[in-house]
């Protein structure tokens, strides 16, 4: 079937099971071929082909609402709703988004990117439906990994309490990105082996209703028998106890079983949870055999061999530099522990996990718990290293404020994927952390200019004993600089001069330092002398350096790959104002006040005007022509 000709899912209504099976093969082949060129979330989507087709066949989108938790498994949904022809632009600048996007299609009713949000949003939609007295199904699709998130459990509790009509699809592939952890995962494991609980339960209830009601004792005994048999028949009744009708487990690749169960769910009042078992990566052997999450999201790859197409790496990944330095220090300090909220592979903690399994803690998709747990460990003299993506640190903000900073606890937060991350887009850009951490009392915030300074700042963080400390580091690779063999602590709150200059100064840090250095060299050739400063401590700033620089009364330009509002540049302006430098000319470059969508980092930097050319032009406008050297 030519998938690019699909306009909407209505064509599925008249298709037979054999035709649907052929469509499944076509979709898998299409995904494998297209994503081999663009990259993307291949394994999650190969696992939900039949489930997605079944949902679109039995329900009527967009009247009926599908909410894809996390959203990375929505590619099949996009194909069935008329977007197959756009897959060549997947996750590229101004191309097809890798997550549901309301402006893309009326079938995308809820935008996602972070996990565990679908149930709360679905509850909101269902309550709105009931208040408006309309009739449509609300169907969140959530994975077993996302179900470990506290927000999802809060929503389950509320939905069950209110007895709201809703069909929750639990897509259980036994993995989120890496293998799942936690007691709830173990409950689901028991449910997988318990058989078709709901059919047996119905027969049981029918039989028990036939027992003659000869007095209250017999009736009470019958109810006790029913409850006892319910616990005997299935080793976990977690969802039933929350108020849901539990249906399953059902084979998520068997159309007959899917149709049977979903039709039953449609007729059932109140909240229903359909437990669907799927195989992540189904139909592509390299993805099927992946047990650590390598094929969850990929770049381009060779279909035949399953080898990834990677540019030749001349420098280590930032995540590896940080995690391997932590590992090196952990070998001589038993107090060091590593903590991750379900991202051991992305944060490059596999080596730490292998060498120190008892000191490597993966809490699952539970950022709030991970953060406060780290705080608890710090109270007992441990040295917790919390490795967390910038975008996911947003989810634990209250814990950072209330539990870490307020108590001034020694927690080292490794803020991975800081700055623009590219193809994953606006839900994953790490551009807000400076603004939401800089104003917190007791917090120290750093970002290195290269991987050598990075390892020294990791050492600095592990030696620091006066409170919380955080290190920002980017996605991707370092610069390939020579690494010192001996680690050293860098004095807190100190900056360094990278290039001397007399007519203007650029203050920056991290990934924008090469841009600043190149701009300064070009300006030098044009007769403009510009100082470049490595402001590696975003907080506390180097106040002595700032006093000296502001005293020279030369134009200052701050550059940051982070949001301008509340950012580093704002801090410099505040310092100048509070210290009486009212005539100082300070301008800022950074991320504007909007969400930055998907695309390559290079393209996104061009789009927002954060380039070497833009820096050169800005400095020229800040320096009067008569002050420029001939």
Swiss-Prot record:
Q: What class of enzyme is it?
A: transferase
- Specify the species: Bacillus mycoides (strain KBAB4) (Bacillus weihenstephanensis)
Lineage here is: Bacteria, Bacillati, Bacillota, Bacilli, Bacillales
Residues that, per the record, bind thiamine diphosphate: 72, 113-115, 145-146, 173, 284, 367
Q: What protein name is recorded for this chain?
A: 1-deoxy-D-xylulose-5-phosphate synthase
| Keyword annotations of the record | Isoprene biosynthesis, Magnesium, Metal-binding, Thiamine biosynthesis, Thiamine pyrophosphate, Transferase
Check the record and name the InterPro entries matching this protein: Dxylulose-5-P_synthase (IPR005477), THDP-binding (IPR029061), Transketo_C/PFOR_II (IPR009014), Transketolase-like_Pyr-bd (IPR005475), Transketolase_BS (IPR020826), Transketolase_C (IPR033248), Transketolase_CS (IPR049557)
Catalytic reaction(s) noted: D-glyceraldehyde 3-phosphate + pyruvate + H(+) = 1-deoxy-D-xylulose 5-phosphate + CO2
Q: Which family does it belong to?
A: Belongs to the transketolase family. DXPS subfamily.
Q: Name one GO molecular function term.
A: thiamine pyrophosphate binding
Q: How does it assemble?
A: Homodimer.
| Cellular component, GO, one term | cytosol
Residue stretches in coiled coil: none
